[in-house]
Amino acid sequence: MIARVISSVLIVWALGFVWFASTLPQPAGIAQTDAIVVPTGSGGRIPRGIALLRAGAADKMLVTGVDVDVRPIEFMAEFGVDQRLMDCCITLGFSALDTRGNARETAEWIADNDYRSLRLVTADWHMRRTAVELADRLPAEVRVLRDGVPTQPSFATLFGEYHKLLAAWLLTLA
């Protein structure tokens, strides 16, 4: 009996990993949201967020998890952002150190600005855990549009992220 339970758990775990690795979230269309949120991390996230902002997918963007040593002028130079766009539309968040912190920082920013919808822009392999952490912090009425940035993650990245997702999901149940 114990062997069957263990075998069943292992099968569910393995199938879950196959599902996780083979169905990574894709970019969303150009649907309008109140804001765009981009956690710092792997390449492509911030350029995707800026492109969406410029295309009118939202009026404001939060980049969460920015290193405290990064100055806005450096951010602007790195990502080709002009002063007008920076002043009107981009907020740099400096308080988050990890994905959970990104969710906390995002929830505070969303509440402070009374937004009802946001586009979450992050790496495809990072999307599910970020969304779980964010859903745990946001009011249920805030709509989150998932916009995955395509990457070529290694097996190790996928394997590690799958387990972080499981842990995040279990923590939300507690």
Question: Which residues does each PLM region occupy?
Answer:
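Structural signal for membrane-spanning alpha-helices in multi-pass inner-membrane proteins
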Residues: 17-24, 168-172
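Hydrophobic membrane-insertion alpha-helices, especially the h-region
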Residues: 3-19
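A structural signal for short, hydrophobic/glycine-enriched beta-strand patches
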Residues: 21-159
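A transmembrane-helix-recognition feature enriched in membrane-embedded lipid enzymes
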Residues: 155-174
